């Protein structure tokens, strides 16, 4: 009897999550539509629906249209976004990005805080202040549900293994923020979160296997295989920026990110122009003015990136490649150079596109990850709508 009782409980919990999945993935649905989609009888669906409603997961929208055969009009429903909210921090070398989201991923607040040259302790204090600010301003039934930190480094078992750009001073971020705010805290690699964004918010919905190249101060790859994030044995999957390139007579033996990361490109332009104030905007402006030296640097970088994509594709055979890069977002014509270089090497038409929202991609990926976690739905496919 005990085993049977456990089995029934497990089955009901599974079905509750399947119904919640339908409500999340279909912003205006009904009990009858869920019943048809899950192939469960109406009485079972009504019981599960009522349980979710009692737990404040559901917001009813009123009557929908009657079916072609008549009968009562269905009550339409969607996820109650104000069930609770999550917070994601992207700990960047130059800026801290802070985002709060309702349960349906709607953005409540987003802030960018200058952090260049500041120690990790000061950055984490900024994070605390943001959480405290949200706790006083955001009205949600269950308040703060969880926190995600995006780390530009290697994460294994929810701990930072390697942080090349920010000295973490051996601070246990998870332990500190769990103790202070009494919610789950997750750390994840920035490129992995960019890949989750493409899977759950963007065109990645069309692909079961995709790779997102994240090109910032370094270069990493977020890998989605059969709709699941692939981290590797010790969280080091996707550390492609350290791979060596043999493209061109002057690049042999150099790491890819030493040539075509945003930081590397800026530094190369800085040296050629002998201008220490050079930044991303400077590079974009010079390129748009058809500066020959900058065009040469960016052309070479596009060639190296294409070679990197080719190596990744031959290893993992994805359906598509996404590139998350602020520099490329401001010079989108360079995408054509990358595509042409890749097709010259590979002789195929693999889709290679830019992330459509470089500003929010990582933070929204973090929102999705922590939302999956706090709902106990890590292995469920959830689709979120991004505001226009």
Curated annotation (Swiss-Prot):
Gene3D superfamilies: 3.30.420.40, Winged helix-like DNA-binding domain superfamily/Winged helix DNA-binding domain. It comes from Lactiplantibacillus pentosus (Lactobacillus pentosus). Belongs to the ROK (NagC/XylR) family. GO terms for biological process: D-xylose metabolic process. One of its GO terms (molecular function) is DNA binding. This is Xylose repressor. Transcriptional repressor of xylose-utilizing enzymes. SUPFAM superfamilies: Actin-like ATPase domain, Winged helix' DNA-binding domain. Keywords: Carbohydrate metabolism, DNA-binding, Repressor, Transcription, Transcription regulation, Xylose metabolism. InterPro entries: ATPase_NBD, ROK, ROK_cs, WH-like_DNA-bd_sf, WH_DNA-bd_sf. Residues 31-50 bind DNA. It comes from the Bacteria.
């Amino acid at each position: 009897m005990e085993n049977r009782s456990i089995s029934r409980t497990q089955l009901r919990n599974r079905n509750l999550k399947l119904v919640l999945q339908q409500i999340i993935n279909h912003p205006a649905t009904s009990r009858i539509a869920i019943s048809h989609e899950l192939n469960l009888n109406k009485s079972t669906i009504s019981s599960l629906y009522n349980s979710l409603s009692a737990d404040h997961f559901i917001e009813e929208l009123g009557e929908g249209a009657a079916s072609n055969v008549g009968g009562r009009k269905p009550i339409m429903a969607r996820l109650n976004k104000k069930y609770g909210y999550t917070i994601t921090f992207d700990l960047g070398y130059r800026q801290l990005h802070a985002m709060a989201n309702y349960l349906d991923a709607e953005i409540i607040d987003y802030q960018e805080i200058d952090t260049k040259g500041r120690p990790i302790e000061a950055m984490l204090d900024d994070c605390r202040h943001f959480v405290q600010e949200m706790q006083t301003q955001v009205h949600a039934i269950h308040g703060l549900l969880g926190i995600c930190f995006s780390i530009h480094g290697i994460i294994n078992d929810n701990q930072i293994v390697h942080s090349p750009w920010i000295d973490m001073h051996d601070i246990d971020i998870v332990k500190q923020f769990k103790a202070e705010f009494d919610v789950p805290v997750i750390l994840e690699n920035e490129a992995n979160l960019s890949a989750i964004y493409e899977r759950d918010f963007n065109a990645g919905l069309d692909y079961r296997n995709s790779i997102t190249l994240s090109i910032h101060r370094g270069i990493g790859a977020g890998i989605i295989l059969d709709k699941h994030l692939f981290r590797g044995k010790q969280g080091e999957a996707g550390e492609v920026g350290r791979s060596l390139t043999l493209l061109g007579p002057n690049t042999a033996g150099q790491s890819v990110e030493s040539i075509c990361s945003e930081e590397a490109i800026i530094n190369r332009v800085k040296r050629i122009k002998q201008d220490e104030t050079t930044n991303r905007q400077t590079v974009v402006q010079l390129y748009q003015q058809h500066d020959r030296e900058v065009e040469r640097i960016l052309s070479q970088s596009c060639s190296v990136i294409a070679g990197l994509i080719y190596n990744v594709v031959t290893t993992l055979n994805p359906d598509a490649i996404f590139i998350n890069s602020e520099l490329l977002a401001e010079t989108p014509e360079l995408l054509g150079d990358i595509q042409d270089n890749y097709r010259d090497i590979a002789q195929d038409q693999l889709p290679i596109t830019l992330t459509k929202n470089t500003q929010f991609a990582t933070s929204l990926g973090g929102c999705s990850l922590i939302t999956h976690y706090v709902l106990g739905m890590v292995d469920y496919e959830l689709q979120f709508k991004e505001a226009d």
